[in-house]
Amino acid sequence: MPVLVSVALVARHSDTLGALQHVEQTISDFIDYSKCWTMAKAVSCRNIRLLRRILVHRGKDDNEGSCMDIERAMEVASASGDMEMVQFLHETYPQHGKTRCLELAASNGHLDVLRWIYKHRNGKDTLTMSAFDFAAGNGHLDVVEWMHANRSRGCSTRAMDCAARNGHLHIVQWLHAHRQEGCTTQAMDWAAQEGHFEVVQWLLLNRQEGCSSIAIDAAASNGHLKLVHWLHEHCNVTCSYFACAMAAERGHHHILEWIGQIEQT
């Protein structure tokens, strides 16, 4: 291995050290590599030079904890969308074990990485229903469209439920138009909890699932007065004692005032 630049620079300013090349190399090796450094850590730092040095020191065929480290490194690279790392690891270790690389690339919206891994997968990694659900829940429409076109199993109701919870109305609308799985009452309940007024409105007008009493309670607990008022008018629901208690605990006095006005009418 070449001597680290930092060690070489110090050696140049020391006549004694500079004359002892074997000592210089030993210092470089000691500084350069530690068993504390894993491939996954190198990948998380986006440092492919460090990754290569770790592999040289360990040896490509070192099995001491390396299988889990290799798979973890691949997953970290896929989750972060680091195509260079992904390609290097898959080409260096084509016979790796089963990983969640496809799912992590999809859920984080890295379509280029997802497509590459899917094309070069070793048969152990599969594109799961959860990958579709996570991609939808996180608002990655390009990934959702690609998975819709390239896999037959589709998604579950969690796709629309989670998209609604996170306020991704465009995903909810796309799933409604192109998929048959639909959603559950959790879609409106979660959207109300997070204060996504437009999502709640759209779901009530375009879907049949409706909501549960959790919707207005969650909206009230989180101080979303506009939603509380709208749900009361359009869904014929009222706040429970629990919602009042949570609103009071969190200082949402405007919610308590509104509830008081409703109770007086």
From Swiss-Prot:
| Secreted keyword on record | yes
The family database entries (SUPFAM superfamilies) matched by this protein are listed as: Ankyrin repeat (SSF48403)
Question: Where is the major localization of this protein?
Answer: secreted
User: What Gene3D superfamilies does UniProt report for this protein, alphabetically?
Assistant: Ankyrin repeat-containing domain
Q: Which residues form the signal peptide?
A: 1-14
Q: Please report, in chain numbering, the residue ranges of the motif RxLR-dEER.
A: 49-72
Question: Repeats (ANK): which ranges?
Answer: 34-64, 69-97, 98-126, 128-157, 159-183, 184-213, 215-240
**What UniProt keywords are attached to this protein's entry?**
ANK repeat, Glycoprotein, Host cytoplasm, Host nucleus, Repeat, Secreted, Signal, Virulence
Q: Can you quote a single GO CC term? A: host cell nucleus
- Provide the glycosylation site positions: 150, 236
Intracellular or extracellular location(s): Secreted; Host nucleus; Host cytoplasm
Family note? Belongs to the RxLR effector family.
Role, per record: Secreted effector that partially suppresses the host cell death induced by cell death-inducing proteins.
Q: What is known of its domains?
A: The RxLR-dEER motif acts to carry the protein into the host cell cytoplasm through binding to cell surface phosphatidylinositol-3-phosphate.
Stated name of the protein = Secreted RxLR effector protein 124
